């Protein structure tokens, strides 16, 4: 299946078949999608909670109580539920961790190359955390890059998913102690196979025309 076919076929799943689970291979592949998403300067300012047990999904679904109860069944019935979390502040230790991993993965031929890479990434990090003072927003944008990459990727795997912002982040952050770890939850994405109750699966896709959204020059 080519990438355009995937983009045209995938949809936001409104109901999941609780009896259909991801295979062990598929479960590993969705984690690989999370790991290899692009991010600005390869900063990777994220963490993910992958819930696949009934207990784990129930913990995530606590955030769908009250106002967001309409999203509860999606979280409980999906095979897996991924919580996308962003760092709340960029720190030097994280930048060092990234460049050290790049070195371990063989991306630098010389110490000077490593130093130059680290200097460049730190420049952009400082632009946001020192000058613009919007590093939390900058890092959230990187997580959304991951969400988009993930949705297209699981679609290419023949799986169904839905991005959810309708949840109580404060409840979810507390449930998993995210604030203490320097993260906050941004998006919840249930993954699995849609059920016959998924009305959105049979509706035609609707998008604004290219003439409205694209300027060519």
UniProtKB/Swiss-Prot annotation:
Its GO CC terms are: cytosol
Q: Which cofactor does it need?
A: FMN
Enumerate the Gene3D superfamilies for this protein. NADH Oxidase
Q: Keywords assigned by UniProt?
A: Flavoprotein, FMN, NAD, NADP, Oxidoreductase
Q: Into which EC class is this enzyme placed?
A: oxidoreductase
Residue ranges annotated as transmembrane are none
List the Gene Ontology MF annotations in alphabetical order: oxidoreductase activity, acting on other nitrogenous compounds as donors, with NAD or NADP as acceptor
- Tell me the residue numbers annotated for binding NAD(+): 14, 41, 67, 71, 74, 107
Q: What is its EC number?
A: 1.-.-.-
| Pfam families assigned to the protein according to its UniProt record, in alphabetical order | Nitroreductase
Task: Enumerate the Gene Ontology biological process terms.
Answer: 2,4,6-trinitrotoluene catabolic process
Q: Which residues bind FMN?
A: 10-14, 71, 165-166, 205-207
Q: How does it assemble?
A: Homodimer.
Q: Which family does it belong to?
A: Belongs to the nitroreductase family.
Tell me more from the record: The nitroreductase might be involved in the quinone metabolism.
What is this protein for, i.e. what is its function? Reduction of a variety of nitroaromatic compounds using NADH (and to lesser extent NADPH) as source of reducing equivalents; two electrons are transferred.
Q: What is this protein called?
A: Oxygen-insensitive NAD(P)H nitroreductase
Q: What is the lineage of its organism?
A: Bacteria, Pseudomonadati, Pseudomonadota, Gammaproteobacteria, Enterobacterales
